[in-house]
Amino acid sequence: MEQQYRTYDFELAGRKLTLEFGKMAKQAHGSVLVRYGDTAILSAVTVSKEPKPLDFFPLTVNYEERLYAVGKIPGGFIKREGRPSEKAILASRLIDRPVRPLFAEGFRNDVQIVNTVLSVDQDCSPEIAAMIGTSAALCVSEIPFEGPIAGVIVGRIDGEFVINPTVAQAEKSDIHLTVAGTHKAINMVEAAANQVPEAIMLEAIMAGHDVIKQLVEFQNMIVSEIGKQKMEVILHEVDPEIDQAVRAYAEARLKEAVRIEEKQARYDAIDDIKAETKEHFAAKDAEAYPEQEKMISEVLGNIVKDEVRRLITDEKVRPDGRALNEIRPLSSETTILSRTHGSAMFTRGQTQALSVCTLGALGDVQILDGLGLEESKRFMHHYNFPPYSVGEARPLRPPGRREIGHGALGERAIEPIIPSEVEFPYTIRLVSEVIESNGSTSQASICASVLALMDAGVPIKAPVAGIAMGLIMSKDEKSFSILTDIQGMEDHLGDMDFKVAGTEAGVTAIQMDIKISGINREILELALEQARVGRLHILNHMMSTISEPRKELSPYAPKIMTMTINPEKIRDVIGPQGRVINKIIEETGVKIDIEQDGRVFIASINHEANLRAKQIIEDLVREVAVGQVYLGTVKRVEKYGAFIELFAGKEGLCHISQLAEERVAKTEDVVAVGDKVQVKVTEIDDQGRVNLSRKAVLKEQAAAEQAAETPTKAE
């Protein structure tokens, strides 16, 4: 039966939130039009009828930006939206992370979530509207989802928390925290902060959760009225006989292999046991083996997972032998690469990141063409994860969602310590190459990038370090273990990946992903404190490598010279169709960027070229003063007079009658092109034309000479 049109209202942070059902996308299994202020999002969810023969849950979350939502037409020749923007990818991840843990384990049906941005009110976050819409659409559909969930943004202004701050409020806030969760627990955190203490970050998270509870109750009320009966699904389960047989054959040996401390040796031993076990069962029953292979692989994986978790929770022993709060051995060095502007390598156990800092002119900023107000980005951090970092051979592809997400996390962590444009007028790009990986690569890239900034001579406000925390819950969920500096196996087999970056003074970024339904305040508080202790340990190590930014930039970095001109003179520097500024660039080899307020930035590796360009610009904007005498150059000779250049870009006419004291028959009799002559500015007319006189200068010179020759009365 077709769903009837229903609307439900909720006041969220002083603005109206409306969920409209039965109006759009009625053939989807669940859909809702979310209106938050003037923001409008269509959230639609669908599910396949049959499960897929996969060993993972095939969930896809899409966040589709449409430029018509902000009244823009896409640029380029095609004039339509292309691949998702970086912001759209991050929004998809933001929605995916709190939703994914709330599907039943063993659910293998395809689930697709599509959020289409139809209209954007900059003061009402479309990401938050899409997150709420996703949850509501799933909850009213027949898809088995253990929600609802909700999310909010938390800011802090003058010590007070603000829910879903407006653009104006966000500019004053020292926290930008997105938190999501269920009525009982928090299951996703994404934060940027300006060196905020852990205790305040915790309170901000809990303040957000208080509003989330209300939004969840609001959705529960909707579900009670219009929710569909959930579909019956076949959850993937392992045949108990296969489980018992595989455990009897391989469990003891796998448990021994898990205790091998060195990563590659441990993985090799586990892989050998798995391969030998599969060969055993293939030989034992060749006919049935093809159907049993996936289950056998799953049981082998479960044995490893169960043993790793048991060792941590019961024996407090980690796969590599570390204590629960112990950080792997650290090493770092700077100036790895001679010709780059700044470089550093940071190693933590078997995780290694090489970061390179490049400084550019302000014209090198990234131009953004999206749904937000931000038009350009002066600081960038990019993250690359090549296959050789984990000893694999696979095709190289453009950065995926993971790489973009890790790059953005590093960018958020480091941005609060980047000097202002006034203090350091450069565009800054950091690139982190993960050259060896055993977990926590995003945090290693943050550490390496900060070292590279200091190596490049960027006057950062304070060094930042990052660390990844893990969580292992007991089967009864009555006890838990928090791990410091998790490695790959602990990340893969654990319940939480909790990344925290910051300075000695406080937090600059947080990212939390979990695989269970949620965590409480106690776990958050302990994880934040344990991360703080670990972060300070890493910062001490980093400071022993380089204690402060270098005093001088690399000789290969551009030197930037700043000057200020009258904004009304900008057009004189640029010239018609940019001819003047392009000529300066061509002659000197510099880069020139001009701001609307009259600030001019000149960049070049060659300091002398900067000075030359600056002199030309100063000449272009110099004001011609009536009564002033200039030494000019004759540029053009006409019957009626000579055009004389006073300085770059400024010419005046010396009429033939003003060339000499006596009458002049021909201009050429007095001056020729290229001659240097002294002239006086006699007039600037209403059209800005400059009239000059050589005659006036000659008269003044003659009068001065006569005065010098005439004896005084005293003589």
From Swiss-Prot:
Enzyme Commission designation: 2.7.7.8
Q: Which PROSITE patterns match?
A: KH_TYPE_1 (PS50084), S1 (PS50126)
- Output the Gene Ontology terms for molecular function: 3'-5'-RNA exonuclease activity; magnesium ion binding; polyribonucleotide nucleotidyltransferase activity; RNA binding
**Keywords, ordered alphabetically:** Cytoplasm, Magnesium, Metal-binding, Nucleotidyltransferase, RNA-binding, Transferase
State where the protein is found.
Cytoplasm
The entry's family comment says:
Belongs to the polyribonucleotide nucleotidyltransferase family.
Name of the protein in its database record: Polyribonucleotide nucleotidyltransferase
